[in-house]
Amino acid sequence: MASTVAGPEIERLIQLLARLPGLGPRSARRAALHLIKKREALMAPLASALQVAIERIQVCHTCGNIDTQNPCTICSDPRRDPAIIVVVADVSDLWALERAHATQGRYHVLGATLSPLDGIGPQDLTIDALVTRAQVPEVTEIILALNATVDGQTTAHYVTDMLQDANVKVTRLAHGVPVGGELDYLDEGTLSAAMRQRTLF
């Protein structure tokens, strides 16, 4: 049986940190030690920020983004193009597109992708809400910004079928050679998609 080297409060902190993505037990222990050593400069502000997050962060009832206001900052921004809705699986995908300044459209977060093996079906996603939004006359294009995985593509096909009766253009992100990518290191599927979706130079 492994012996504990710290009191129960510190062990609890380590256990909670180890639940975070990318942090195993060893990384969690290092993070806990760092927080404890920087108690005033780091731990107290972090605890305060977490308390604010618990009290104020909510899910946007329009798009599914998380924010401290509802509708969220993006949905409330009049500079956003109301004609375009970018569909993503998760809030992290929305944030990635925002960091890249990839679109001035609005978003719709599905909450996941269809995955029969994980028991995730259409009823677990916000597809019905997307269909309702797509029927608003000012919406003209739905961009499917879903991962190029089996689950992502299955979801894209399902969403496209559900949007058949809406008077919108449905597009998806191009797949292919990444910026700075070398052909020799790319998988066959990526190369095949890049060749099929080639554009004029």
From Swiss-Prot:
Query: Keywords on this record?
Result: DNA damage, DNA recombination, DNA repair, Metal-binding, Zinc, Zinc-finger
Instruction: Give a yes or no for keyword Isomerase in this entry.
Output: no
Q: By its UniProt entry, which SUPFAM superfamilies does this protein fall under?
A: Recombination protein RecR (SSF111304)
Q: Name the Pfam families on file.
A: RecR_C, RecR_HhH, RecR_ZnF, Toprim_4
Q: Which GO terms describe its molecular function?
A: DNA binding; zinc ion binding
Domain Toprim positions: 83-178
Against CDD domains, the record matches this protein to: TOPRIM_recR (cd01025)
Q: Which GO terms of type biological process are on file? A: DNA recombination; DNA repair
Q: Which residues form a coiled coil?
A: none
Q: What Gene3D superfamilies has UniProt attached to this entry? A: 3.40.1360.10, 6.10.250.240, RecR Domain 1
Q: Describe, by residue range, where the zinc fingers (C4-type) fall in the chain.
A: 60-75
Q: Which NCBIfam families match?
A: recR
Entry-linked HAMAP family = RecR
Family, according to the entry, reads as follows: Belongs to the RecR family.
Query: So what does this one do?
Result: May play a role in DNA repair. It seems to be involved in an RecBC-independent recombinational process of DNA repair. It may act with RecF and RecO.
Q: Protein name, please?
A: Recombination protein RecR
Gene that produces this protein:
recR
